[in-house]
Design a protein with these regions (language model features):
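Active-site cores that bind ATP or allylic diphosphates and position pyrophosphate for catalysis
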Residues: 1-34, 41, 171, 176-177, ...
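Catalytic adenosine-cofactor/nucleotide-binding cores of aminoacyl-tRNA synthetases and other
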Residues: 5, 9, 19-168
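Helix-rich, typically C-terminal accessory recognition domains appended to large enzymatic cores
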Residues: 118-128, 132, 186-208
Length: 208
């Protein structure tokens, strides 16, 4: 192409820059029109904050492939993003990280760095109940409030329920008779006493 451009059009051809494919981790194949495996921005925005998507592109050289992760690799990506963003805010980031962050940050408002892994793990335990999440965060020494984790809460819930449902904690809708029938007499009595105590008395979440 370079020779043709020069000899026929007397024009110096532009330098070719090849781009690697973007992978889809947690799914089979690569993102390509020829394979029919494509992701829309709307799909990615169900699990990624916009800045994290831009960060993945900004930190990757054109000739280096990277993955959009639908498996637990996404938690590592959020962790790495948070680490770089924190160093950027604190002024300890090197020039490379500063350039990346300047390329991917969209708004002047600061991003709330509530760990995505915590939202997934703890959110699953309390069924993503906001009040209970705030209580649990306070109990473990990280008193995040809803205003701080609201931007990521829906993303964490969507990812867990749609991309990693096998890791979700679910309360049984009915009694697990299989387990109950394997209990001995003392164990069944203990379960009955616990049920009676909880049902006949009112307890706050704090007391429990």
């Amino acid at each position: 192409a370079g020779v043709l451009a020069k000899k026929i059009f007397d024009y110096e051809a532009t330098i070719f820059q090849g781009y690697e494919f973007i992978g889809i981790k947690g799914s089979t194949g690569k993102m390509s029109g020829s394979t029919g495996l494509n992701l829309t921005p709307a799909t990615l925005l169900n699990i990624y904050q916009p800045e994290v998507i831009l960060w993945l592109y900004a930190k990757s050289e054109p000739n280096k492939a990277f993955d959009f992760c639908f498996d637990d690799g996404i938690l590592r990506q959020y962790f790495e993003f948070d680490k770089q963003y924190k160093s950027y805010l604190e002024g300890t980031a090197d020039e490379y990280v500063r350039d990346i962050m300047n390329s991917c940050l969209m708004f002047e408002e600061k991003i709330k760095l509530v760990p995505m892994s915590h939202l997934v793990q703890l959110g699953s335990i309390v069924d993503f109940n906001v009040d209970m999440l705030e209580t649990v965060f306070a109990k473990i020494g990280t008193p995040y409030r809803y205003e701080e984790f609201k931007d990521r809460l829906g993303l964490a819930k969507y990812w867990l329920e749609n991309c990693s449902p096998e890791n979700a904690n679910k309360l049984c809708p009915v009694r697990n008779w299989k387990v109950y029938n394997e209990l001995d007499g003392k164990e069944r009595e203990a379960v009955s006493l616990l049920h009676k105590e909880l049902s006949e008395n009112e307890y706050t979440l704090e007391e429990l």
